[in-house]
Structures are given as C-alpha cells and as structure tokens.
Amino acid sequence: MIMTTPIHVYSEIGPLKTVMLKRPGRELENLTPEYLERLLFDDIPFLPAVQKEHDQFAETLKQQGAEVLYLEKLTAEALDDALVREQFIDELLTESKADINGAYDRLKEFLLTFDADSMVEQVMSGIRKNELEREKKSHLHELMEDHYPFYLDPMPNLYFTRDPAAAIGSGLTINKMKEPARRRESLFMRYIINHHPRFKGHEIPVWLDRDFKFNIEGGDELVLNEETVAIGVSERTTAQAIERLVRNLFQRQSRIRRVLAVEIPKSRAFMHLDTVFTMVDRDQFTIHPAIQGPEGDMRIFVLERGKTADEIHTTEEHNLPEVLKRTLGLSDVNLIFCGGGDEIASAREQWNDGSNTLAIAPGVVVTYDRNYISNECLREQGIKVIEIPSGELSRGRGGPRCMSMPLYREDVK
C-alpha cells in the first residue's frame, strides 16, 4: 500500500496501518504519593513492568500489520535543527511558567546542553530542582518554594497518546487539554507536523488548534465513518470547542457532514467518551450501561451540515441506537455492555477500561486481559479479541485506545 498522505483516518475500525505510541519512561518514576492528584494519577506504576507490558502492546500491533511510531522519537527528529530546538524550549518553558519560579534562564541553559533525544527525554521526565547546579538562594520565592521538588513537572500521562491530538480524515485537532498537568503535551504534536520530514511538506489541515480557548481532548473524538464523527461532551471536552470544530470541519472542505455530540456524566471514572463507548465493528459498539438512563435514554445532539458550509442544523435526540442507525445508514446496531451489564462487574471493568477497546480491523480489537467478562461478551458477538497484559498499564486509568493515536487506517470496504 502506498501512502500519499501521512494522516488518513476515516473510521474507528479500518485496518490500522500507522499508529503513534509513547513508551512509558522516567516520568513515571517522578510520581510520588504527595503529588499524584496534581499529576492526575491514582497510583504509581512499576516502571520495568509497565514498560514490558507496553512493549507487548506495541509488538501486538506490529504483528497485526501496523507500523508503530513513537512520540518521543518523532519529537526528537522534529527538533534536530538547533534553532527549532531553542524555539521549542522557549515555548515549553513559557507554558511551564518557569519564569514564575525564577528558573527560566537556568533551565534554558541546562536544556540547551543536550542533544535532541536527551532533551526530549528530560522535558518529558520532568526536571527536579536538585538536577540543576545549586546556587545561593536570594529571592523570597526561591526560599519559600523549596518544598516542591520540580522546576518542570513530569508528564506521566504522555503514554496516553490519544488525547493531546486526534486524527480526523486527512487532518487533525491539536488540543487544548483541560488539566494544567497535561496542557503542554499537545505542543509536541504541533512541532512534529510543522518540522518532522515525514509531515512538514504535506500542509496537514489542523481542524482545531491548541490555542483555542476552550478544551477538547482526543479521547472524546471518534471517527465513525468518512462523514460522521462522534464527540463526547464530557469532563474534559466542552460544547464550545465542539461547536467551533464542527464549523471548521464543515467550512474547510473536509468530508465530514455530521457530528454527534454525546453527553456523558462529568466524572473521573467517565473521563472521555472512549472510556464508556467504542466502535468494534461496522454495526457493533461497546458501551458502559451507566451512561444511559433507566430506559436507555441519553442526550445526543446531531449537528449536520446544511446546503452551505455555514449552515448547521442541530437536533436533540435521546435514543443512541436509533441515532447510530440513521446517521451511519445501518439496518440495526448491537450495543455490547461492558461487564455483561452486571451492575458490579460493569463498574469494576469500566474502571479498568473494559469499554476502551482499540479496533485494528473490522471486528478485531485489542483489550486488557483483566476485563475477562467484557472480553467474553465481545467474543460471544463474533468479535476477535486480542488481549494484552495490563496489571501496571491500567494504573494510569487508560486502555488500548487511550494509549494509541492512529495516523493511518485503510478505508473500510
């Protein structure tokens, strides 16, 4: 297969050909109990074990025919030029508010001593105060902030590559993320598409950029087919960002003709739409039953392009299967309940990402092995399930879909 563009994602289930991952690194060893909440973790993964599990995830994708790229390697290659690297450091330090803690100049000087690979590892891992040469403290803020160990916070959530940017069609969104702990993450993708040889010559459309004032995250963005995108209105994604993205998609000659804005409960357990709802085949979906009302009802806003790109028709609907059938042109859909629909099992397995499947072809998904009830439910419906070990990976509260950013999928025949 000849790829004429580096980004091509017109479905959730097309055969996966290129995907971007981030191998967990030293950033996880900069987690401590005191700062877990600040850095959006509930526990501290054991690094050698989580790396082994992640390597098995990557190997599984390769065995299924996918090219695996790594965020850290792409970023380093994009920053090969010294001037671009210095520009990146300036932008990163500004966003990290390094000027507030008085360390901007020292951090910049420190980071410029590294080659691109080492510098990228350093900023992803975080910079502890004791890593810089000690100087006599003379400013009040220096004396008072000694208890906090970092000049630059680590980025332990980076192995969830789904969220900072998301491919839609031939372009992508580079997202303004909600939480300060993750906001710097999308800067890497901006530099990759602007400066990496694989991407920079292709004029890749950016449907929504990270400087937009409202939040959106990739875990809420699902490409259902070449004309339809579902986006979660969630704890992390705002209605305002969705509306702007819809207008940009309609006005900029994308193939997208409709967007389903799916409201889900705003809680950490249901962080993104893909933690409670994913597509596994042309007409089959996993769903966590707790996002629906007693009668299976929920709020779904269908935004459709009118006769002109500026004209948007919005309707509110409440029956997810009916909306999916109509918008995807299906005679029927099958919703497969996480945990088999059992109240306890579904809550337990959803917490460990039982609904967060990664489709690598129609009817073929990668899942966590610990969600054995959900996996069996998928198999009973004819889905091929490829399980990966998850004892440490799942501590980060994200599953196979969260840990992957598809860049190229073959079209669904």
From Swiss-Prot:
HAMAP family: Arg_deiminase (MF_00242). The active site is at C402 (amidino-cysteine intermediate). Its main location: cytoplasm. One of its GO terms (molecular function) is arginine deiminase activity. It catalyses: L-arginine + H2O = L-citrulline + NH4(+). This is Arginine deiminase. The keyword Hydrolase applies. Keywords: Arginine metabolism, Cytoplasm, Hydrolase. InterPro entries: Arg_deiminase. GO terms for cellular component: cytoplasm. The keyword Membrane does not apply. Belongs to the arginine deiminase family. The gene is arcA. Its EC number is 3.5.3.6. It is found in: Cytoplasm. It comes from the Bacteria. One of its GO terms (biological process) is arginine catabolic process to ornithine. Pathway: Amino-acid degradation; L-arginine degradation via ADI pathway; carbamoyl phosphate from L-arginine: step 1/2.
